[in-house]
Amino acid sequence: MKLEILEKINDSDYNEIVDDSKKSTFYTSYKFLEFIKENLKIKPSFIVSYEKSKINGVFPFFIKEGEYGKVINSLPFFGSYGGIISENSKIDKAIITEFNNYNKKNDVLSSVIIDNPFCKNEKIYSQFFNCTDIENRLIQSIILNSNSNEIWNNFEKRTRWSVRKSEKNNVEIIKFEHESEELENFYNLHLESMKKKNGRPKPKKLFSLLTKNFVNDRDYNIFIAKKDGRSISYILVFYYKNFSEYYLPAYDPNYLPLQSTSYLIWKSIQESIKRKIKFYNFGGTWKTQKELYLFKRGWNATDYNYKYFIFKNSELINSIGLEKILEKYQYFYISPIK
């Protein structure tokens, strides 16, 4: 077995192992890594394992250089997760050992592996990654293992009521094609929503990079709800293998009583069923987000637990202060907030 740390990898070589692996998700796809790269202006790095010149394992990660040292995430940027993609525990161990050595030899402030919730690989990281902290996380995902009627009947009554309210109020659902004004309105509604929640908005260039890096109606759809010709809510959904990723919603608060976001979700679930997708992934939910958790549970979403495995320089982080450090490493995870 041969191991290398690369700053560039051939996309066909990467796709060959990732597309065939049960451990890969949308977030570890080559297209999404390119999407992160252009959003963050940082190139990904890879630990690659070879057997007879053929790749049999890969570990993608991003390094943010800063005045306090390197911060490494596999993977950064709004709820992404990464980890090792291989089908052999010996390869996993070898890659983790190489990563441990990299962390030790370099000026690393924090190095984080965000485990894939769907492949249960956490024992490998628990045993072999030299972590100082482990943080528990949760995502919620609908398992699409039956027909549309059965899935509908498994939703809670309040969820079905929300969808029907939009239908009764003649809300129309369309798919985005190429209208730049729709992307502009989508972003403005997202920005307004994040300001009200005191949250961090996604960068505006995400939308131009979306149409550059992905193919509409193949890699993603933007579903748009309209009332009397006016666009009142949006959701962006990505598709990759067995996964639909509910990535970004936005809505006009003046039309909130129409429950159009629920109608959009249902239409996107129906689209996912047509595509024979297995998981409709709502993504992460914080422990403090009880209302959001109950909203997702109303769709009969299943809980999937996963972990952040963190190696960090605790002494340096404590002396500088985590809030001050976070300002310099935007879109990267560094340490639990205590």
Labelled PLM ranges:
Residues 48-55, 79, 87-102, 208-320:
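Aromatic (often tryptophan-rich) hydrophobic motifs at membrane interfaces
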Residues 46, 59, 63, 125-150, ...:
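Active-site/acyl-donor-binding loops of N-acyltransferases
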